[in-house]
Amino acid sequence: MELLTGAGLWSVAIFTVIFILLVDLMHRHQHWTSRCPPGPVPWPVLGNLLQVDLGNMPYSLYKLQNRYGDVFSLQMGWKPMVVINGLKAMKEVLLTCGEDTADRPQVPIFEYLGVKPGSQGVVLAPYGPEWQEQRRFSVSTLRNFGLGKKSLEDWVTKEARHLCDAFTAQAGQSINPNTMLNNAVCNVIASLIFARRFEYEDPYLIRMLKMLKECFTEISGFIPGVLNEFPIFLRIPGLADMVFQGQKSFMAILDNLLTENRTTWDPDQPPRNLTDAFLAEIEKAKGNPESSFNDENLRMVVGDLFTAGMVTTSTTLSWALLLMILHPDVQRRVQQEIDAVIGQVQHPEMADQARMPYTNAVIHEVQRFGDIAPLPLPRITSRDIEVQDFLVTKGSTLIPNMSSVLKDETVWEKPLRFHPEHFLDAQGHFVKPEAFMPFSAGHRSCLGEALARMELFLFFTCLLQRFSISVPDGQPQPSNYRVHAIPVAPFPYQLCAVMREQGH
């Protein structure tokens, strides 16, 4: 007992501090060489956690980029990270070294939520045979699946009409468009996965969207960041269950939908939806322990498609309508092109896009300016690589700062302003600079890119074909400030949609 009092206690404390510092130094030394990227000096144990704002990481990285350059190091706890900025460095990492940077690091909060070998879905799965199998299945299904006798475009076009009908019911009123946009995009995903559509007033749909919103809130910000850096806190009884209530509730909703689908699935009939196609693959894979087609992975893949494909598209559409309010001259020019190419009676089709360079440019500029996913999910290096003459060692976590590419001053004429001419040449033809990477690039590019582009074009043109969007009477002009969350959304705003008259 005497050891724990007086000088003995101080000796124990000093020994403990020295031990922690030595362990910390060994962790750093494993990844440090003279050729490593520069970066801020880290604190022992905490690293650079106190030097960045976890609630607004893009701005923190912007300031660090100005100081240290396009490739710099961070130490988050004991995890070495390298942040990649600018088009040139991003191309090196995602394309030139794509095979060596396609892996995912382990994310403790996702492991707690059920991501594990055999049930890792496709978005979070490590780079390897399991990921390749699920990526191939998801991409081919999204591209080629015929839902009954309807193509995917038919489903999106049908939902665009329902969305316009919902706007018509509130024409001339002050409305928040986000709920209706979420409903429409969610129904497209539900049609693809379950061949099912919900009425916008359906309590089941309302609850599902509420839980999905909570999911994104729960995985962003300070607390999840701390849990990822110090996963020992996940062992505190009840803490993780309290933090991730929305995640569990949302997956329970998907489980119910999967159960309903399974009870009506007939393996002798052509698949009605993605779930049927996955169930058929499970049957084929029975007896093959190497296959990633199993019941647990089905729910993870479905969860990936909902979370990755729903809120991102609806948030982009929310930015689109806001920017049309703030730039009425752009809105009028889009409507003129719609009238000239499609007219005011015929429904928009994807085939119209090639003849509508200005509308296409506006949609692309909405994605660039909105910048809704500035920091995609991190990567991890599977071997040593060189980036901009710096050595990035094996096992380093990579943070691709897509915002630095979409707003790269060396590429874009007016990077911080909404300027559709970024995507038009001198003759008014549509052009797409290589710095346009809202869907990322390389092996881990967004698997739902084709579907998202279809939804953005058909929903946007359908709405502007039928309505003029403006600020409601008596309300202030909304701002283009952003809410730094996942995804990055505009501040809540109200709009007034007025039916367009024929010929206007």
From Swiss-Prot:
EC number: 1.14.14.1
PROSITE patterns, sorted: CYTOCHROME_P450
UniProt: heme binding residues: 446
Enzymatic reactions: an organic molecule + reduced [NADPH--hemoprotein reductase] + O2 = an alcohol + oxidized [NADPH--hemoprotein reductase] + H2O + H(+)
Protein's UniProt keywords contain Signal: no
Broad EC category: oxidoreductase
Domain of life: Eukaryota
Localization annotation: Endoplasmic reticulum membrane; Microsome membrane
GO CC list: endoplasmic reticulum membrane
Classification via Pfam families: p450 (PF00067)
Cofactor(s) this protein requires: heme
Signal peptide segment: none
Membrane topology field: Peripheral membrane protein
GO molecular function list: heme binding; iron ion binding; oxidoreductase activity, acting on paired donors, with incorporation or reduction of molecular oxygen, reduced flavin or flavoprotein as one donor, and incorporation of one atom of oxygen
Similarity annotation: Belongs to the cytochrome P450 family.
Function: Cytochromes P450 are a group of heme-thiolate monooxygenases. In liver microsomes, this enzyme is involved in an NADPH-dependent electron transport pathway. It oxidizes a variety of structurally unrelated compounds, including steroids, fatty acids, and xenobiotics.
UniProt name for this protein: Cytochrome P450 2D11
